[in-house]
């Protein structure tokens, strides 16, 4: 099972990815984690990424795509994987299709967690309040201004992927405002038909 989880920040992609990892026994692939692992392992592409990050620049699509391609060749991805936070752009979506095609693979599903923006802001504020109450640090991106900027960035760059995957017949939406268990049930129903 090879799938992508789409949705704005705070929609619950990470939460659902962790649940699916347990249920499907396939890894969650996060580009941030993959970049850090490639840098730590000092792979050729990891060295390139480190040089860019050390210079304080954003890692290019070419480097991110190469790291994803390297990662999906690992044995634990043989039965599939969950892409969370990637692809973020149409160019990256094209790269995913190309890298899978080169391996004779395809995506099984693209699941969009559909949420209400106002409710998302409330969800993020609650997450920050809960962290403070528990004496835990508040995530930098749980600040309303930072979050709203991330939301704008999502709609500008990532939201076009919804149309891209819809046109390919891969996109399925779930009610991301439902309870965690209900969202999981909806996703499982989609995957059973994939």
Swiss-Prot record:
One of its GO terms (biological process) is AMP salvage. One of its GO terms (molecular function) is ATP binding. Its main location: cytoplasm. ATP binds at residues 10-15, 127, 178. InterPro entries: Adenyl_kin_sub (IPR006259), Adenylat/UMP-CMP_kin (IPR000850), Adenylat_kinase_CS (IPR033690), P-loop_NTPase (IPR027417). It catalyses: AMP + ATP = 2 ADP. Gene3D superfamilies: P-loop containing nucleotide triphosphate hydrolases. AMP binds at residues 31, 36, 57-59, 85-88, 92, 139, 150. The keyword Secreted does not apply. One of its GO terms (cellular component) is cytoplasm. It is found in: Cytoplasm. Residues 30-59 are annotated as: NMP. CDD domains: ADK (cd01428). Keywords: ATP-binding, Cytoplasm, Kinase, Nucleotide biosynthesis, Nucleotide-binding, Transferase. It comes from the Bacteria. Residues 126-142 are annotated as: LID. Pathway: Purine metabolism; AMP biosynthesis via salvage pathway; AMP from ADP: step 1/1. Consists of three domains, a large central CORE domain and two small peripheral domains, NMPbind and LID, which undergo movements during catalysis. The LID domain closes over the site of phosphoryl transfer upon ATP binding. Assembling and dissambling the active center during each catalytic cycle provides an effective means to prevent ATP hydrolysis. Belongs to the adenylate kinase family. Catalyzes the reversible transfer of the terminal phosphate group between ATP and AMP. Plays an important role in cellular energy homeostasis and in adenine nucleotide metabolism. Monomer. PANTHER family: NUCLEOTIDE KINASE. HAMAP family: Adenylate_kinase_Adk. This is Adenylate kinase.
């Amino acid at each position: 099972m090879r799938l992508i989880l789409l949705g704005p920040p705070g929609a619950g992609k990470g939460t659902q990815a962790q649940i699916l990892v347990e249920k499907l026994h396939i890894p969650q692939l996060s580009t941030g984690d993959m970049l850090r692992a490639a840098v730590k392992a000092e792979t050729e592409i990891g060295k390139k990424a480190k040089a860019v990050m050390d210079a304080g620049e954003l890692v290019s699509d070419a480097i991110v795509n190469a790291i994803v391609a390297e990662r999906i060749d690992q044995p634990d991805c043989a039965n599939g994987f969950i892409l969370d936070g990637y692809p973020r752009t149409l160019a990256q979506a094209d790269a995913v299709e190309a890298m899978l095609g080169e391996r004779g693979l395809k995506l099984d599903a693209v699941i969009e967690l559909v949420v209400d923006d106002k409710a998302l802001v409330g969800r993020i504020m609650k997450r920050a309040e809960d962290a403070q109450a528990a004496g835990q640090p508040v995530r930098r991106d749980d600040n309303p201004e930072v979050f709203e900027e991330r939301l704008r960035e999502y709609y500008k760059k990532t939201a076009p992927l919804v149309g891209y995957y819809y046109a390919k017949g891969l996109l399925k939406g779930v009610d991301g405002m439902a309870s965690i268990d209900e969202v999981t049930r909806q996703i499982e129903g989609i995957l059973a038909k994939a």
